[in-house]
Amino acid sequence: MTWGSKLRDLTPVERHGGMYFKRDDKFAPLGYGNINGSKLRQCIYLVDKWYDEGNLKGVASGSVSQSPQHAFIAAACRHYNVGCYIVSGVRKPLEHKYLRMAHEFGAHIVSSRVGYAQACGAQARKASLAWEGFRYLETNITLDLEKNSFRDIEGFHRVGAWQVMNIPEDVETLIIPCGSCNSVTSILYGIMMYPPPGLKRIVLMGIGNMGSNDIGYVRRRLRAVVEVNLGLDTDEYFDFNFASENAKYDMVHLNLNGTGYCTYQQEMREAIGDIRFHPRYEGKCIRYLKERAPEYLTPTTCFWIVGSDVM
């Protein structure tokens, strides 16, 4: 049985500390505490799709040394028994956790002279074009709107959209961490297809990348997918100006990075019950909510855990 057969399994919604948590960190094919989360699901979706199309011999990718995507992609490649070529901008990759994990999963890791994610990705893309049967998995585990078909992008987001289906009926506020924003795009797509009956408010928490610097990216992707597939107007559901006067849902954007609260590199360790939040992502969100926005921590709030750190 391939990991592709697990893509529609619903991760649980649990109560901890008097509120709900959507545990997408429990999408963990190798067991809880290993690689996990929404982005892993999307990574597996792509590799599984390419494998089913036939003649897949390997996957090439590139990103900064701290990116969890290295371990995700390498593990998926090992599962499907294909090669994995990773480009990163460090000379000693085994000193970095996710690159070390990728190496243990069997990836071939090379260094780029320029360590920026864009440069690493470009080098990986060039390699994928040169080698028969290799596919390029884009930096941040995404599909560029300009370089991929509508059908491929819609399928990529639909695999995460399913997870909305078990949001409890009494949830009124949904809080979503936003980094590269592919997970939140999938979640909002799911809300449009399978509206949780009690949902009134959506809080987007910017923790870097698009979530802090270009939250309109989510609207652009939704419009590209939803308006073609469902014939619905994205703006009738979500107001990305955050005025919420004419949209179905009250939208709030809390931008943590770049506003003086924290930087991307900082880590904040937080826990509620037995949940240990990722210190670079969800941990910052929980700390911010406790310190600056406690009004959202209510019994009818659900916090979406996109993923947790590897133990």
Where are these regions (language model features)?
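Phosphate-binding loop/pocket of nucleotide- and phosphate-handling active sites
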Residues: 290-311
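A short, small-residue-rich loop immediately preceding and capping a beta-strand
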Residues: 54-75, 79-88, 172-180, 200
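Small/polar-residue-rich loop-to-helix segments that shape phosphate-bearing ligand pockets
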Residues: 91-170, 239, 244-265, 270
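Histidine-anchored nucleotide/phosphate-binding helix
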Residues: 45, 68-80, 184-195
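Gly/Ser/Thr-rich loops at beta-strand to alpha-helix junctions
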Residues: 63-71, 91-93, 176-187, 281-285, ...
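Active-site/ligand-binding loops adjacent to catalytic centers
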Residues: 193, 199-283, 287-294
